[in-house]
Amino acid sequence: MNLEIVFQLTALLFVVAAGPLVIVLLASRGGNL
């Protein structure tokens, strides 16, 4: 496998995982949106 492909997959996984995580953090910190 190419290192560039691995990097792109890692970045994609990071974005997919960070999306809901940021929403949960904002919801828990700010209370109700």
Swiss-Prot record:
An example Gene Ontology biological process: photosynthesis
Membrane topology type: Single-pass membrane protein
Keyword terms: Chloroplast, Membrane, Photosynthesis, Photosystem II, Plastid, Thylakoid, Transmembrane, Transmembrane helix
Location of this chain's protein in the cell: Plastid, Chloroplast thylakoid membrane
UniProt key word Secreted: no
Major localization class: plastid
GO cellular component annotations of the record: chloroplast thylakoid membrane; photosystem II
Pfam families, per the entry: PSII_Ycf12
Keyword set includes Flavoprotein: no
Record field: transmembrane: 5-25
Family per record: Belongs to the Psb30/Ycf12 family.
Function as written in the Swiss-Prot or TrEMBL entry: A core subunit of photosystem II (PSII), probably helps stabilize the reaction center.
Subunit structure: PSII is composed of 1 copy each of membrane proteins PsbA, PsbB, PsbC, PsbD, PsbE, PsbF, PsbH, PsbI, PsbJ, PsbK, PsbL, PsbM, PsbT, PsbX, PsbY, PsbZ, Psb30/Ycf12, peripheral proteins of the oxygen-evolving complex and a large number of cofactors. It forms dimeric complexes.
Record protein name field: Photosystem II reaction center protein Psb30
Species whose genome carries this gene: Chlorella vulgaris (Green alga)
Gene (name only): psb30
